[in-house]
Design a protein with these regions (language model features):
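Phosphate-binding active sites in nucleotide-utilizing proteins
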Residues: 182-243, 251-252
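Acyl-donor-binding surface of acyltransferase catalytic domains
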Residues: 1-5, 73-80, 85-160, 298-302
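Conserved acetyl-CoA-binding loop-helix of GNAT-fold acetyltransferases
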Residues: 91-104, 238-241, 247-264, 283-288
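Short amphipathic alpha-helix that is part of the acyltransferase structural core
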Residues: 1-45, 155-190
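Short loop/turn microsegments at loop-to-beta-strand junctions
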Residues: 10, 54-56, 208-210
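Conserved donor-binding loop and adjoining core beta-sheet/short helix segment
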Residues: 16-19, 24-109, 115-120, 216-217, ...
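Active-site/acyl-donor-binding loops of N-acyltransferases
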Residues: 130-151, 256, 265-305
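Generic hydrophobic alpha-helical scaffold/packing signal
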Residues: 177, 211-215, 224-227, 237, ...
Length: 305
């Protein structure tokens, strides 16, 4: 924290105990831009499990409350920073100070690129990023569907079988997931041991009955990882089909199966995130399944060397 914060504010690292207050900050920032937020304490804690808060987080505060916050993590060649300023305290240079700290941390980790995100509707954030020398890289959609009635049963192509995930086959699931996503923009494969610890051990919401595998004989053709609840909605965390099995309706069948399972559990809304320029045409698939764009986010990046 080499540079003092603006206006004599205090600065410290985030801790798990800060989660409720920081969630309130994020919610206020989202609501100011788009009128609603899907932030929650469990989701925030999930992100923090991937971060080194002791070295890669910053909390700006006065004597009464947290005014701004950012945290990040190394992701391939990027240092990815996620930051928020309370709408009542914008225009004080807090966001620029946090970006500078993210750039400093990227240098410490020898990462050649700083990357961050904002809601597509947040013009103030876009101006800040551009003034900081960043450029727009990619757009992402949060897509949702409201389930007004029980979905029709999913139908897979002949010869394929849908199974519930067996934690004893986690390595095969992980391998199939990596292969399915290897061509995605900004994708970095997480080592299996780290992935297993994060998803199967540390995650309090891990529910193997919401993870699915499509098999073609002994081969895994597709995998799906779902979360039981994110801000009141069932959430599709990952859906991947290996290349030899694409264009056969498997992804749509998996999605419909997940819709049905969420509906059976009382969830009437299902959401997911997707790269708007996904090379496999996932956005069109989700639209065919009845999903619509709820909001857009934008990725910005800055080359540091």
């Amino acid at each position: 924290m080499s540079s003092p914060p603006p206006d004599g504010l205090g600065v410290r690292r985030a801790t798990v105990d800060d989660a409720p207050a920081i969630d309130e900050l994020i919610t206020a920032a989202d609501v100011a831009v788009q009128g609603w937020s899907e932030s929650s304490v469990p989701e925030l804690l999930g992100w923090w499990r991937m971060m080194d808060l002791e070295h890669s987080s910053w909390v700006l505060h006065d004597e009464e409350s947290i005014l701004a916050y950012a945290a990040g993590f190394a992701h391939g060649d990027n240092f990815e920073l996620d930051g928020f300023v309370h709408p009542d305290h914008q225009g004080r240079g807090l966001g620029a100070w946090l970006l500078a700290r993210g750039e400093d941390r990227a240098g410490e980790l020898r990462k050649p690129r700083l990357q961050t995100f904002s809601l597509a509707a947040d013009d103030r954030a876009h101006r800040l990023f551009e003034q900081f020398g960043m450029r727009q890289l990619r757009r992402y959609y949060r897509m949702m569907i409201e389930l007004e009635e029980a979905p029709l049963p999913a139908r897979l192509p002949d010869g394929l079988e849908l199974e519930t995930f067996d934690p004893g086959e986690a390595k095969a699931f992980h391998d199939a997931l990596i292969e399915a996503f290897e061509d995605e923009w900004n994708f970095v494969a997480m080592p299996f041991d780290q992935w297993r610890e994060l998803r199967l051990v540390q995650d309090p919401d891990f529910d193997p009955t919401l993870w699915f595998v499509v098999r073609d004989g002994e081969e895994i053709a597709a995998v799906m990882r779902n979360e039981p609840d994110r801000s009141g909605a069932g959430f599709v965390g990952a859906l991947g089909v290996r290349k030899p099995w694409r264009k056969r309706g498997i992804a749509l069948a998996l999605l419909q199966h997940a819709f049905g399972e969420f509906y059976r559990r009382g969830k009437r809304r299902v959401a997911l995130g997707v790269d708007a320029e996904n090379p496999t045409g996932a956005t069109r698939l989700y639209e065919r399944a009845g999903m619509q764009v709820a909001f857009e986010a934008v990725a910005y990046g800055k080359e540091l060397r």
